[in-house]
Amino acid sequence: MAAPEEFFTGVLHEDLWEICIGEKLGEGMSRHVYVWEPDPTLVVKIETQRHHWYNIEEFNTWNVIEHTKHARWFAPVVAIAGGGSMLLQRRTQPLRRDELPAKLPTFFTDTKSKNFGLLNGQVVCHDYGIHMLRERGMSSRMINADWWDLEEE
């Protein structure tokens, strides 16, 4: 599928892109993440693949856990576009290797270190489009964190 900026064609769309979409912070298999210029404490995640629905999954997950004790592990979702193609989320800061927790809640399965960051001094997951909350529930059980991407370094 096309890069997100290719969706923004025409004067209005180009102007919106210029005003709202800031520095590119990263990309994954189906989304690109940018600073949200109107409020740099937020990021905008733009879906680049059809039928993946990770933005919608994160939005729904946040709505389920927002008022639970488990919310402390998640970067809050602020808003989502009606079709789910764009999601606004609180911006986290990158973690140093020594800041990665040794244990995580059992429902986190995509334990790539770059899926986590710091928000107000707390380690949170900012990429939770894939998780095991439905299968494992909102358990307080902790497991050893397997930071699989660090083995490559």
Model regions and ranges:
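ATP-binding glycine-rich loop module of kinase domains
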Residues: 20-70, 82, 86-87
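Intrinsically disordered, low-complexity segments enriched in small/polar residues
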Residues: 8, 20, 24-26, 119, ...
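Short secondary-structure junctions
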Residues: 17-25, 75-76, 105-106
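Conserved kinase catalytic-core helix
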Residues: 65-153
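Juxta-kinase regulatory segment immediately upstream of eukaryotic protein kinase catalytic domains
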Residues: 1-22
